[in-house]
Protein backbone atom coordinates (compact mmCIF):
# COMPACT_ATOMS: atom_id res chain seq x y z
CA UNK A 1 0.00 0.00 0.00
CA UNK A 2 1.54 3.30 -1.05
CA UNK A 3 -0.42 5.52 1.33
CA UNK A 4 -2.53 4.25 4.22
CA UNK A 5 -4.88 6.95 5.53
CA UNK A 6 -6.58 6.64 8.90
CA UNK A 7 -9.95 8.37 9.02
CA UNK A 8 -10.89 10.39 12.07
CA UNK A 9 -9.55 10.38 15.60
CA UNK A 10 -10.28 7.16 17.50
CA UNK A 11 -11.41 8.27 20.94
CA UNK A 12 -11.49 4.65 22.17
CA UNK A 13 -7.87 3.80 21.33
CA UNK A 14 -4.83 5.56 22.81
CA UNK A 15 -3.02 7.48 20.07
CA UNK A 16 0.24 5.87 21.20
CA UNK A 17 -1.21 2.47 20.26
CA UNK A 18 -2.42 3.74 16.89
CA UNK A 19 0.93 5.30 16.01
CA UNK A 20 2.78 2.15 17.11
CA UNK A 21 0.54 -0.02 14.89
CA UNK A 22 0.99 2.31 11.91
CA UNK A 23 4.75 2.31 12.43
CA UNK A 24 4.76 -1.50 12.53
CA UNK A 25 2.96 -1.59 9.16
CA UNK A 26 5.56 0.73 7.62
CA UNK A 27 8.52 -1.12 9.14
CA UNK A 28 7.14 -4.46 7.92
CA UNK A 29 7.07 -3.09 4.36
CA UNK A 30 3.32 -3.50 3.96
CA UNK A 31 2.79 0.28 3.83
CA UNK A 32 5.10 2.94 2.37
CA UNK A 33 3.58 6.06 3.94
CA UNK A 34 0.84 7.00 6.38
CA UNK A 35 -1.67 9.82 6.31
CA UNK A 36 -4.60 11.03 8.38
CA UNK A 37 -8.02 12.43 7.64
CA UNK A 38 -10.58 14.62 9.38
CA UNK A 39 -8.76 15.50 12.59
CA UNK A 40 -8.51 18.69 14.56
CA UNK A 41 -5.12 20.38 14.33
CA UNK A 42 -4.32 19.58 17.97
CA UNK A 43 -5.08 15.89 17.41
CA UNK A 44 -2.94 15.70 14.29
CA UNK A 45 -0.06 17.52 15.94
CA UNK A 46 -0.32 15.32 19.05
CA UNK A 47 -0.03 12.20 16.88
CA UNK A 48 2.97 13.66 15.04
CA UNK A 49 4.66 14.60 18.32
CA UNK A 50 4.15 11.12 19.76
CA UNK A 51 5.58 9.54 16.61
CA UNK A 52 8.60 11.83 16.64
CA UNK A 53 9.22 11.41 20.37
CA UNK A 54 9.21 7.62 20.00
CA UNK A 55 11.17 7.43 16.74
CA UNK A 56 8.16 6.21 14.81
CA UNK A 57 6.84 6.95 11.33
CA UNK A 58 5.08 10.31 11.01
CA UNK A 59 2.18 11.24 8.77
CA UNK A 60 3.07 12.70 5.37
CA UNK A 61 -0.43 13.79 4.38
CA UNK A 62 -3.67 15.19 5.77
CA UNK A 63 -6.99 14.72 4.02
CA UNK A 64 -9.10 17.61 5.27
CA UNK A 65 -12.55 19.03 4.64
CA UNK A 66 -11.85 22.17 2.64
CA UNK A 67 -13.67 24.25 0.04
CA UNK A 68 -14.87 27.80 -0.59
CA UNK A 69 -17.69 27.38 1.94
CA UNK A 70 -15.78 25.52 4.66
CA UNK A 71 -12.42 27.12 5.40
CA UNK A 72 -12.09 26.48 9.13
CA UNK A 73 -8.81 24.60 8.68
CA UNK A 74 -7.12 27.80 7.46
CA UNK A 75 -6.78 28.89 11.09
CA UNK A 76 -4.60 26.09 12.47
CA UNK A 77 -4.39 22.89 10.45
CA UNK A 78 -3.25 24.32 7.11
CA UNK A 79 -0.51 26.53 8.61
CA UNK A 80 0.74 23.57 10.67
CA UNK A 81 0.83 21.30 7.61
CA UNK A 82 2.62 23.94 5.55
CA UNK A 83 5.23 24.48 8.26
CA UNK A 84 5.75 20.72 8.71
CA UNK A 85 5.82 20.04 4.93
CA UNK A 86 2.77 17.77 5.15
CA UNK A 87 0.79 17.40 1.93
CA UNK A 88 -2.91 18.22 1.84
CA UNK A 89 -5.57 16.28 -0.03
CA UNK A 90 -8.83 18.17 0.52
CA UNK A 91 -12.13 16.35 0.33
CA UNK A 92 -15.51 17.82 -0.59
CA UNK A 93 -14.06 20.53 -2.85
CA UNK A 94 -17.54 21.32 -4.18
CA UNK A 95 -19.11 21.46 -0.73
CA UNK A 96 -21.39 18.44 -1.23
CA UNK A 97 -22.84 20.12 -4.32
CA UNK A 98 -23.47 23.50 -2.70
CA UNK A 99 -20.80 25.29 -4.73
CA UNK A 100 -21.75 23.93 -8.15
CA UNK A 101 -25.52 24.38 -7.85
CA UNK A 102 -26.81 26.27 -10.84
CA UNK A 103 -23.87 25.41 -13.08
CA UNK A 104 -24.83 24.85 -16.70
CA UNK A 105 -22.21 23.54 -19.07
CA UNK A 106 -19.55 24.12 -16.44
CA UNK A 107 -20.21 27.84 -16.09
CA UNK A 108 -22.16 29.61 -13.37
CA UNK A 109 -25.40 31.29 -14.32
CA UNK A 110 -24.98 35.00 -13.81
List each language-model region with its residue ranges.
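Acidic/hydrophobic-patterned starts of short beta strands in beta-sheet-rich repeat architectures
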Residues: 3-4
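Beta/alpha (TIM)-barrel catalytic core signal, keyed to glycine-rich beta->alpha loops juxtaposed to Asp/Glu
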Residues: 10-110
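Histidine-centered active-site/metal-ligand motif
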Residues: 7
Amino acid sequence: IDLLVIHRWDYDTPIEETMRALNDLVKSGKVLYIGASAMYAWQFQKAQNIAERNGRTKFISMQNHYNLLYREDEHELLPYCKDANIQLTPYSPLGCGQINKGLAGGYASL
